Each structure stands twice: as structure tokens, then as C-alpha cells.
């Protein structure tokens, strides 16, 4: 069995090289394949994670025998997956995005991408930790990633299948986050955001935070 490896930018069978940020927030890169380099590929959506997704998809197409023109066209038409850099509001005054990131490495990569895309805007993030065990094991790493923001609102931990663990709560991140941060109850979230009127807002998490997206987007329509 032939095994192929792919990566974001680590040299292997398939990876992205010479990654550049475009003015619209998307990334252009050279796709390195085992037998060629396909230069200047630009996915249809922004974000580092989408570069890696494109590399993975292109690798499968290459194995299936697609030629360079079709590989390039497939990357250009890539529109992302649900809850990965989903734009709900994108106006000169306000930007609101939602993303599924729920692991510290994902969170850091996503926040870094947003910072690259909109370097002049104040970044407000709403993060809903997912699982008590994950929060317990990675709360320091979560806090480190969230420190890249200008302001953080933490929702209570989404338990999913787990029972509460004594002493494990969103509050344990607060002393370690290097920017203004607070815990907000879900029922108060929209009121808090309405009072803050953030210019650049991203909601993160794998729980039920996406249920608020339409309601949050509506806040900006009122401005």
C-alpha cells in the first residue's frame, strides 16, 4: 500500500510552500506535489486551516489522477466547510465570524489568521470551552492562545457527554489570559455584545455557541 503524507507547510509528499497573505485575507501558495509544483494557488476562502484543507483535498485529487488545471480550479473554487471562518457580517464598520476551533492549537491558528486579515481592528473573541476534561488538561494553553486577542468573553464550559469536574470551570482561565477577559452567562451574551458593539468579533467553540450566530449578526444590522 502506497502511503502519502500531507501537511500545511512541512515538507512531505504534499504541502504548501511560499504562503502569502493577499489584501482580501486569503492566502496564495505553491502546492508541492510528488511530481510537480503548482504555483500561485488561492483558495476561495481565508484562513490557515483552509490552506491545509486545500492541500489535503488536492492530494486526494492528485492520487485520483486529476491534472494540474483541474487541481488549480478545484482549489480556487474551494468555499470552505461549515463553521470554519464563516462570515456572518462583513461591512466597513463591523466584521463577525464564527469558527469551530476548540483545541488550543486550532484556536491559536485561527486567531493568528484573523489578526493577519484585519491587523488594524480591535479583536473581541467569545470562546465556549468544550468538555471539562479538555479544559482541565489545556486551560493554560487556551489562555495563552486567547491572550492574542484584545478582549475575551468566556462562556461556561459546554459539557457534551461529561459530568462536571469539581474545580474545573471557565473561570480558571481568567488569571492567565493576558488581555481583558470575563465570564458571561449564555443568556446574557447578546446583551453584553450589544453594549460593547465590537468592530471585529469571532465566536469559537464546538458546543452550542453556533446557535447564537444569527442573533449576534442581527445586533450589527441594528447599528
Regions found by a protein language model. Give the residues of each.
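Extended acidic/charged loop-beta regions that coordinate divalent cations
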Residues: 1-38, 81-84, 88
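Nucleotide phosphate-binding/pyrophosphate-handling subdomain across enzymes
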Residues: 33-151
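A glycine-rich beta-strand to alpha-helix segment
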Residues: 188-219
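C-terminal helical cap/extension that packs against the catalytic core
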Residues: 25, 143-199
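Residue-level signal for inorganic ion chemistry
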Residues: 3, 16, 53, 57, ...
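Short glycine-/acidic-enriched loop or helix-start segments at secondary-structure transitions
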Residues: 15, 135-136, 163-164, 211-215
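Short glycine-rich anion-binding loops that position phosphate/pyrophosphate groups of nucleotides
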Residues: 102, 129-132, 157-160, 206-209
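Structural beta-sheet core signal
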Residues: 5, 125-127, 154, 203
